């Protein structure tokens, strides 16, 4: 007798072993038709999986997140099937699920063209309509390797040969195609109804640039056409908001091959940067942080003591001078500990909060670089809090309050918080980890926020809180972190004199709110589609005259606003006013002031707000007050 407990708490009993599909059918024909897989005691399995003992079972359908993953994984295999059908000489490699879709890497003698993608997608649709059953068989490693060698699939054979000889291998087949996979997969290809191939890109075999370059075909798959249409619309909007395109259009920055992963900031882009930095500087100063500056280049011995030289060496830029090795800092923390160590610290000095807009460099691979979002040279709004164990909860509460307030000011109202918990390999005792994790939970609870816990995702030296902001398109970006560190203070000899005159290690909290300034500016640009709020806008106001006779008034008006701290310019060119308005509208300037003879004579201005909103004619002082109220919260 096999007892199966369902998610609603009910128990079904069967006199003999049953498959997931048979359980679904016994519940009802609708569920049998909808079933894509199952979850047996939390493990995702195929509908063909046999249940021969008492278990908890959930039937997975396309209404479940796991169901969508199964669909996407199966669609990746359908893609490989179609490619092999159309291009038999192509070699298949790997095809995983990724955010919003999947990809599959192929080795082929020539580049796939857009026309090829159309043919492949059409063939996928034809194969899906055949509704061919998907079967699974388990074989030995050697049998699987021999099979793929026999059909000339050298990459698959290489993958299999890297698996321990004692492991069994799952092979999935539909029609004339067989692939290696952990699964699970849909029961038949007819379940794959909504998909689209997106693009082709280059990729290296096993992610190593020394290996052969492959062709990676990206695709997306969904349960409903409306969902796919919404996703494709979001991609169109994302393309319009692409910070690289807007950076060029708005003359904010550029990048070039002579300095890969580094940014050339133009005047307007640097003005935007300064608004963010000065705002952040004011907020951390108000929160009791002390701003410091640490060297960009430090001796190898310090990085060895911190552990970075041993564990992070490949990502560090290094140099040598006078027979000494140095590293250009990839992070600020060791330098901050040096400042803490410079002098005897008492418990009365704590908490000590050191902040730095620290310039860091990391040797990211050239293929990973992406505009402002992934760079080699960047500045962090970094800070480290040195405190006692009794203080770390209150410090965590204060940081969370500050971070959430900052995100709100920048226009991000939707923030997801994640708490990464202890990994298997870790420093410190279970008792220390219990206190650290519970302390962060208590801090988040006190702040009235909800969070998701990620078991095993913490660093080996402590648990971490992550802040993921959602932009206008619903995309999630991890920006802020609060990382408890139980290792670095000991490695670098940080200590303070406790109340009983003993020497103790401080608790060290690594924290950042925006993270990389470059990346955060890229997120900001895309979130606001380049139309920055007035307090952030590189140029807040442009004053335009209609004719030469108003030039002097327009110039004096701009000078008056400039003295009030407004970022303003006067456009006195001998051009049609409609031309000037259009040009500055494309520059996304928040306020355009137009002056003609009437405005000059009455000492007024005609005001147009961004978006073509006509605010009418008003006295100069009235406009100044409007602008002041627009920006005062943030300045």
Swiss-Prot record:
Region span, Catalytic: 242-533
Any one Gene Ontology molecular-function term assigned to this protein's record: threonine-tRNA ligase activity
CDD domains: TGS_ThrRS, ThrRS_anticodon, ThrRS_core
Annotated cofactor note: Binds 1 zinc ion per subunit.
InterPro entries linked: aa-tRNA-synt_IIb, aa-tRNA-synth_II, aa-tRNA-synth_II/BPL/LPL, Anticodon-bd, Anticodon-bd_dom_sf, Beta-grasp_dom_sf, TGS, TGS-like
Keywords recorded for this protein, A-Z: Aminoacyl-tRNA synthetase, ATP-binding, Cytoplasm, Ligase, Metal-binding, Nucleotide-binding, Protein biosynthesis, RNA-binding, tRNA-binding, Zinc
Catalytic activities: tRNA(Thr) + L-threonine + ATP = L-threonyl-tRNA(Thr) + AMP + diphosphate + H(+)
Subcellular location: Cytoplasm
Family affiliation: Belongs to the class-II aminoacyl-tRNA synthetase family.
Stated name of the protein: Threonine--tRNA ligase
Annotated organism of origin: Paraburkholderia phymatum (strain DSM 17167 / CIP 108236 / LMG 21445 / STM815)
